[in-house]
């Protein structure tokens, strides 16, 4: 089968032939319908990115996948052969990951795609929606508090705006002027130029890092999305960062909320798996709204 890898000596992804995997007792084997390409994939595909994650000779790429279950391990009771599922590979370093013809995932990392959700589009949801949901959890009690979501037009930021609103936060999205219509469609306020020290909390979808603290009142809360690059605290601000972890029940809920329209499903485009390098170049150029998907 084919798998997208980062290889030594290459700064773009390589599509290579690898053996067909076999499901372990707690795993499911998925025939891929689509796999998303995220900015983190583009970073890891480069020499600098490989070094940052201590990659070996072969490093599989991809976090999100949707597809049909071909086989299940003998300990799996929640997923059946034939189910159409979406899932997240939350192990940063692995020889074969989500961008492949066939994908192995632990059963607790996948959820059945609900009726009404396009199975291909479902591949755009797991990583970014789970990251946003778990980041909102870290913000604490929303009662009477204001939140600025940076990068509100992006994938994590867009989900975070909607999820924080539904959790009870008074939300303002910070983004480009072209993002205003999308952000306001969630019921949140929008700004392209946020006021300093005006918010109780910041969820940093744009990865502003230290710069993002400037928008927070003394004693507020900052939640970042780069756990490997901690932000030094100041002015009594509580600083933390989300490290996404698999959560099948939460993913099922997020997929359901995508069907109802509460969470927007945004796909920038699809391309064959063989054209991974072209898609990586598009994602690496920045400014994408929605995820590019690789299809076998």
Where in the sequence are the language-model features?
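NAD(P)H dinucleotide-binding glycine-rich loop of Rossmann-like/cofactor-binding domains
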Residues: 78, 87-151
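Residue-level marker of beta-strand positions
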Residues: 64, 83-84, 102, 146, ...
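Mid-domain Rossmann-like dinucleotide-binding core that forms the NAD(H)/NADP(H) cofactor-binding site
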Residues: 123-193
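Local beta-strand N-terminus motif with an aromatic residue
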Residues: 100, 144, 188, 198-200, ...
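Glycine-rich beta-strand-centered segment in the early N-terminal region that forms part
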Residues: 19-37, 49-91
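Glycine-rich cofactor phosphate-binding loops and adjacent beta1-alpha1 units
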Residues: 172, 182-240
């Amino acid at each position: 089968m084919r798998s997208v890898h980062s290889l030594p000596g290459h700064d773009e992804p390589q599509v290579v032939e690898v053996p067909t995997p076999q499901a372990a007792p707690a795993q499911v084997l998925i025939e891929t319908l689509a796999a998303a390409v995220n900015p983190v994939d583009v970073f890891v595909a480069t020499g600098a990115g490989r070094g940052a994650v201590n990659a070996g000779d072969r490093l599989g790429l991809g976090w999100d996948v949707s597809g049909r279950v071909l086989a299940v391990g003998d300990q799996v009771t929640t997923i059946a052969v034939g189910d159409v599922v979406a899932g997240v590979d939350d192990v940063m370093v692995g020889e074969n990951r989500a961008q492949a013809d066939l994908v192995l995932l632990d059963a607790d990392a996948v959820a059945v795609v609900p009726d009404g959700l396009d199975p291909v589009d479902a591949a755009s949801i797991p990583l970014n929606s789970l990251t946003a949901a778990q980041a909102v959890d870290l913000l604490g009690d929303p009662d009477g508090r204001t939140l600025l979501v940076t990068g509100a037009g992006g994938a994590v930021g867009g989900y975070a705006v909607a999820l924080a609103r539904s959790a009870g936060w008074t939300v303002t999205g910070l983004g480009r002027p072209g993002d205003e219509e999308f952000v306001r469609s969630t019921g949140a306020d929008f700004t392209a130029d946020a006021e300093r020290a005006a918010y109780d909390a910041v969820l940093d979808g744009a990865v502003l890092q230290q710069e993002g603290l400037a928008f927070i009142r003394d004693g507020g809360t900052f939640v970042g999305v780069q756990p490997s690059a901690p932000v030094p605290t100041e002015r009594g601000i509580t600083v933390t960062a989300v490290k996404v972890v698999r959560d099948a029940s939460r993913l099922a809920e997020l997929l359901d909320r995508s069907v109802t329209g509460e969470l927007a499903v945004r796909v920038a485009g699809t391309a064959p798996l063989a054209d991974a390098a072209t898609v990586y170049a598009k994602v690496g150029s920045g400014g994408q709204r929605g995820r590019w998907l690789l299809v076998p």
